[in-house]
């Protein structure tokens, strides 16, 4: 079945479902994310004017993207967080969200961090044209490295 995605801004009504499936995901569990902590993080983001999008199909939220226009070095676009519902991974949702972020970016490049152990994500971003340009040890939690990925964008 082909998904027909709509990307729109996150609303408070989206938060409970997203927080539930994020908390059930091993990657997020590695970072000690709970349903309550993630719901609070999204709610706080909304309250503080963060730019958070959701991808939905037939009114079902399948993924989210937290985008910061000048979030890297106060000049470049930054994907702060991205997540896809576990049963919709490898369905094109993540790719659509990343292409959406790239199209929104006004800078000539876009950055993101990826868990060092998340090799599936490394391959995903590399297929989209991102390159690993660095590594930060113990940045989010002790014992876990975050890899810095960057893509140069062709902006007119």
Which stretches of residues belong to each language-model region?
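Residues forming the Rossmann-fold NAD(P)(H) cofactor-binding site
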Residues: 95
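Conserved beta-strand-loop-alpha-helix junction that forms the acyl-donor binding cleft
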Residues: 89, 112-122, 138-144
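Acetyl-CoA-dependent GNAT
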Residues: 5, 9-89, 98-100, 104, ...
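Conserved GNAT acetyl-CoA-binding A-motif
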Residues: 98, 105-116
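Conserved active-site tyrosine of GNAT-family acetyltransferases
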Residues: 125, 130
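Glycine-rich phosphate-binding loop
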Residues: 92
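Terminal substrate-recognition subdomain of acyl/acetyltransferases
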Residues: 142-156
